[in-house]
Regions:
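Glycine-rich catalytic cores of cysteine/serine-nucleophile enzymes that process amide/ester linkages
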Residues: 34-47, 93-134
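Short glycine/proline-centered loop/turn elements that form peptide/ligand docking sites
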Residues: 18, 84, 97-100
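Catalytic cysteine-centered active-site loop
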Residues: 35-87, 139
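Non-catalytic ligand/cofactor/substrate-binding and regulatory segments of enzyme domains
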Residues: 17-34, 135-141
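Sec-dependent N-terminal signal peptides
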Residues: 4-15
């Protein structure tokens, strides 16, 4: 009987010792889809584009990245070619409607990206026009 208890407790200890990061990207998307947009927001009641990708980096990749689009662009690894983008890469756009002049989202696959789009849309998946990309950054090398 003792052997059975020990056998059961070891897997449970392993499960509870896991960190809360490394959430699969698909699960993260499902959890945040249609969250309202709020400039300066950082949670489910409202989030802006840079806080959204900051949260994604932490929850999916276990990496804490800077809070603003400008500091994110400056601190992350450069992806030189649009053809070498991978799911999870951050894509930055110039934006006249953003206070910083930039917008950021997370590349998914098949020319789609996930982002906190603005007050009317919130967090959505959008088709990507690669011509509109300003720069691409990778969270993990």
């Amino acid at each position: 009987m003792i052997r059975k208890i020990v056998f059961i407790l070891i897997p449970l200890t392993f499960i509870f010792s896991q960190t809360l990061c490394q959430l699969p990207l698909n699960d993260f998307i499902a959890d945040w889809l249609y969250t309202p947009y709020k400039l300066g927001g950082t949670n489910k009641s409202g989030i802006d584009c840079s806080a959204f990708v900051q949260r994604m980096a932490l929850d999916v990749f276990c990496v804490n990245i800077p809070r603003t689009t400008v500091t994110q662009m400056k601190s992350l690894s450069v992806v030189k070619s649009k053809d070498s983008m991978k799911a999870g890469d951050l894509i930055f756009f110039k934006s006249k409607s953003s206070p910083t002049g930039y917008h950021v989202g997370c590349y998914l696959w098949n020319d789609q990206f996930f982002h906190a789009a603005g007050r009317k849309a919130g967090v959505i998946i959008s088709d990507l026009d690669k011509k509109s990309i300003y720069v691409i950054r990778r969270i993990l090398n």
